[in-house]
């Protein structure tokens, strides 16, 4: 008995396997037609899907995609017929088959376009032969695509909602539907803004921040919920680490909707964290101008002045706070701290001898600041004795500096 070399045996087995796995277009087409004739549209589609996923040649064969479109169209019509027969249709399958029909049509058109581009490069005069037919299939379900997006949005299935709305918007520009050489025109209503708005809301609700940014510009023209859309854009840009877009949207939102806390507060945090205290001051100043009787905006304005070391202006703003609310312990405490700093600055600047008249001028100025600080801290204590962190350390210092021993001892029972 003659033994075959191991390598030859393996090669023969490999060859047999390749032969068994060879793409047979005629067999695929026959299987497809058999299932279509028997109205087994799901099986017909599965036959094409298997061939496309398994064989490279099949994946580039436009004829197979046309077959798949036909099968999908029958599946859609099958569900549609149930409506007229008072039978319960599978709405989700109905919509998903339409979506897949669109995907398949776009894929088929792109494959044909690649082939035509190659032929044109060779100097051949060619045109799309399949585009018109595919377009007719897609246009038949045009309203269903956007309808599916709204259906899933109302069901709070936001990933699915965005998928359909995105398909609807993308295909508004697809050559497959906009090619003027094809007789049937794309006749969408003027719904770009409304559909973009729902797409943005769906994308944000499903944490699809890139999806938000894709349709944000269009949706920003929707005046009905513009402030909400701008806020969504800001938050999405922040998630994407797109600081430039986030800041532009924040500034736009604050300019148009200063009453929306999100724009104001986020802008303030951004400017302060970036060390742009002057911009933060300008922002809060606008709010004080709009709401002069707001204690909170006046208080924030005072704090911004302090960050810029504009202490006199800060005291004026804190004074406005206590005019609005005479028991504002925080503002009294803040003014006390400013007067303490002023006293300490005077002390550090005393570099003249006791014999110099300026020495006593500075000592008196320092004492006046301590007195003002003392008054402020005592008022803070009066109105918020339960919050010693506002006044305890300040009073200890001013009582010591003003030689108020009895008052200083009275503070021993308090703990910060």
Please state what every model-predicted region is.
Residues 12-80, 85, 91:
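Start-of-domain marker
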Residues 44, 98-101, 161, 212, ...:
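Single-residue signature of alpha-solenoid repeat helices
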Residues 56-59, 173, 224-225, 258, ...:
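Short coil turns that delineate tetratricopeptide repeat
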Residues 67, 181-185, 191, 198-201, ...:
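Canonical tetratricopeptide repeat
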């Amino acid at each position: 008995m003659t033994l075959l070399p191991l390598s030859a045996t393996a090669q023969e087995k490999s060859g047999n396997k390749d032969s068994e796995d060879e793409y047979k277009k005629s067999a695929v087409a026959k299987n497809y037609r058999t299932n279509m004739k028997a109205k087994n549209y799901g099986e017909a589609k599965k036959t094409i899907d298997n061939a496309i996923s398994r064989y490279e040649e099949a994946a580039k064969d436009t004829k197979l995609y046309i077959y798949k479109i036909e099968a999908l169209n029958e599946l859609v019509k099958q569900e549609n017929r149930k409506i007229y027969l008072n039978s319960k249709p599978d709405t989700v399958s109905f919509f998903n088959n339409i979506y897949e029909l669109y995907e398949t049509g776009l894929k088929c058109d792109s494959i044909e376009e690649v082939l035509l581009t190659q032929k044109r490069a060779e100097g051949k005069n060619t045109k799309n032969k399949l585009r018109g037919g595919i377009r007719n299939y897609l246009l038949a379900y045009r309203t269903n695509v956007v309808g599916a997006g709204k259906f899933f949005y109302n069901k709070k299935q936001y990933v699915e909602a965005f998928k359909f709305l995105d398909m609807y918007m993308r295909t508004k520009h697809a050559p497959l539907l906009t090619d003027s050489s094809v007789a049937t025109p794309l006749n969408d209503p003027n719904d770009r803004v409304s559909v973009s708005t729902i797409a943005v809301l769906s994308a944000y609700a499903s944490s699809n921040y890139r999806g938000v940014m894709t349709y944000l510009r269009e949706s920003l023209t929707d005046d009905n919920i513009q402030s909400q859309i701008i806020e969504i854009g800001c938050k999405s840009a922040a998630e994407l680490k797109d600081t430039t877009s986030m800041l532009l949207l924040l500034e736009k939102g604050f300019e148009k909707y200063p009453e929306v806390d999100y724009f104001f507060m986020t802008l303030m945090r951004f400017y302060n964290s970036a060390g742009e205290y002057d911009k933060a001051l300008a922002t809060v100043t606008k709010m004080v101008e709009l709401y002069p009787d707001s204690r909170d905006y006046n208080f924030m304005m005072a704090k911004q002045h302090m960050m810029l070391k504009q202490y006199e202006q800060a005291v004026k703003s804190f004074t406005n706070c206590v005019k609005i609310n005479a028991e504002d312990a925080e503002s009294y405490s803040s003014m006390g701290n400013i007067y303490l700093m002023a006293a300490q600055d005077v002390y550090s600047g005393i570099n003249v001898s006791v014999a110099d008249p300026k020495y006593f001028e500075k000592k008196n100025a320092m004492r006046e600041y301590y007195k003002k600080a003392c008054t402020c801290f005592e008022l803070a204590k009066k109105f918020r004795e339960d919050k010693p962190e506002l006044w305890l350390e300040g009073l200890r210092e001013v009582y010591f500096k003003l030689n108020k021993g009895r008052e200083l001892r009275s503070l021993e029972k308090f703990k910060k």
